[in-house]
Amino acid sequence: MRQIAFYGKGGIGKSTTQQNTMAAMAEMGKKVMIVGCDPKADSTRLILHSKAQTSVIQLAAEKGSVEDLELDEVLVEGQWGIKCVESGGPEPGVGCAGRGVITSISYLEEAGAYEDLDFVTYDVLGDVVCGGFAMPIRQGKAQEIYIVTSGEMMAMYAANNIARGILKYAHSGGVRLGGLICNSRNTDREDELIIELARRLNTQMIHFIPRNNVVQHAELRRMTVIEYDPKNEQADQYRQLAKKIVDNDMKTIPTPITMDELEELLIEFGIMEQEDESIIGKAAAVA
């Protein structure tokens, strides 16, 4: 069994990419489980055709404790027999959402949820923002990480931060970076830029996913593209990504770059202009 995790900036299309890719894997005959590690509990909605799956934390609160839960209450099978679990989290402003991830994964292990699987995938909130969300990395639960990014500065900034988190635990937990997935925003020279970023991070751009409106059409119906329009070229993009992950033998310890190096890269590719110190802090009327 391989345990992988998808990380990336919030709003980058991580959950959509993860669900479509796992759908393609299941279509290939792989036995897959998705563990959502986001308080929004939206990591399985396209597989289950639901708004949000009832989470481990929510059910535990209703029952009294995690120990009172039955596995079939939190683990739901969706399309192609994909097993789905959402860790969930507390109400906004109350408690630590990262604790939900820790509690849920521990419960799933004890309850035997990981038996007879080829792939377990963790869909993790945004950046590596706290120890709880970093748990799949920190405790070696996820052996390989895929970072969803784009040619936009903040997406690349988040990717570099995540690489830094992987590096921190690479020697103690054995986690490795499997590659960058470019979820295209149609920015200039985007594929070249992400290939170069990957090179500097000591990894690969494992796949470039072109922008296609069929993804949104499928999402409105709470479906993956694989199910909604299986013959669409976008469905083939996810199939290609799934196969590349299955066959991937390039799992590395990343080499994060500095903020200055990232800005130099963006300037080199024309995404950012060279900073003119003489105009910093000057209003339009003065400049």
From Swiss-Prot:
<keyword id="KW-0408">Iron</keyword>
<comment type="subunit">
    <text>Homodimer.</text>
</comment>
<keyword id="KW-0411">Iron-sulfur</keyword>
<keyword id="KW-0560">Oxidoreductase</keyword>
<dbReference type="GO" id="GO:0009399">
    <property type="term" value="P:nitrogen fixation"/>
</dbReference>
<dbReference type="Pfam" id="PF00142">
    <property type="entry name" value="Fer4_NifH"/>
</dbReference>
<comment type="function">
    <text>The key enzymatic reactions in nitrogen fixation are catalyzed by the nitrogenase complex, which has 2 components: the iron protein and the molybdenum-iron protein.</text>
</comment>
<dbReference type="InterPro" id="IPR005977">
    <property type="entry name" value="Nitrogenase_Fe_NifH"/>
</dbReference>
<feature type="binding site">
    <location>
        <begin position="8"/>
        <end position="15"/>
    </location>
    <ligand>
        <name>ATP</name>
    </ligand>
</feature>
<keyword id="KW-0067">ATP-binding</keyword>
<dbReference type="GO" id="GO:0005524">
    <property type="term" value="F:ATP binding"/>
</dbReference>
<keyword id="KW-0479">Metal-binding</keyword>
<dbReference type="InterPro" id="IPR000392">
    <property type="entry name" value="NifH/frxC"/>
</dbReference>
<feature type="modified residue" description="ADP-ribosylarginine; by dinitrogenase reductase ADP-ribosyltransferase">
    <location>
        <position position="99"/>
    </location>
</feature>
<dbReference type="GO" id="GO:0016163">
    <property type="term" value="F:nitrogenase activity"/>
</dbReference>
<protein>
    <recommendedName>
        <fullName>Nitrogenase iron protein</fullName>
        <ecNumber>1.18.6.1</ecNumber>
    </recommendedName>
</protein>
<comment type="similarity">
    <text>Belongs to the NifH/BchL/ChlL family.</text>
</comment>
<keyword id="KW-0004">4Fe-4S</keyword>
<feature type="binding site">
    <location>
        <position position="130"/>
    </location>
    <ligand>
        <name>[4Fe-4S] cluster</name>
    </ligand>
</feature>
<keyword id="KW-0547">Nucleotide-binding</keyword>
<keyword id="KW-0535">Nitrogen fixation</keyword>
<keyword id="KW-0013">ADP-ribosylation</keyword>
<dbReference type="InterPro" id="IPR030655">
    <property type="entry name" value="NifH/chlL_CS"/>
</dbReference>
<dbReference type="GO" id="GO:0051539">
    <property type="term" value="F:4 iron, 4 sulfur cluster binding"/>
</dbReference>
<feature type="binding site">
    <location>
        <position position="96"/>
    </location>
    <ligand>
        <name>[4Fe-4S] cluster</name>
    </ligand>
</feature>
<dbReference type="GO" id="GO:0046872">
    <property type="term" value="F:metal ion binding"/>
</dbReference>
<dbReference type="InterPro" id="IPR027417">
    <property type="entry name" value="P-loop_NTPase"/>
</dbReference>
